[in-house]
Amino acid sequence: MAVLTAPQSDLLDREASTLPVGEVAAYLQDKLGQRMTAFLTGLSDAKQIGRYARADGPEPRAAVAQRLRHGYKVVRMISDAYDAETAKAWLFGTNTRLDDEAPIEVLRTAEKPEQSTAVIRAARQLASFQE
């Protein structure tokens, strides 16, 4: 299990904000699947994630792109520290740091930056955990 360090966290922050959104969508589609990624972004059409992931695919609306980028950060942190299955389970489990809400619900419905930041902080704590 790889532990997330501060330099790795900074690198991941830069990567999540600079990668083309199509690559971000492709990563999430690979790790979570289309349905779960669509749920995270609030999209009703799961196939839209596949369209975003194509090299010649459309650009998502700003709010969807932001949710994709936040989801990427969270899934990447946990997948790198543990694995994709742990990331999936963590996204759907209630979290006391998020007022007992599931992280995926908070990301999906976030209207303020601090809501997404709380999820990212909770994921960072899990990924930085040392035994």
Placement of each model-derived feature along the sequence:
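Non-transmembrane "mature" sequence context
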Residues: 1-131
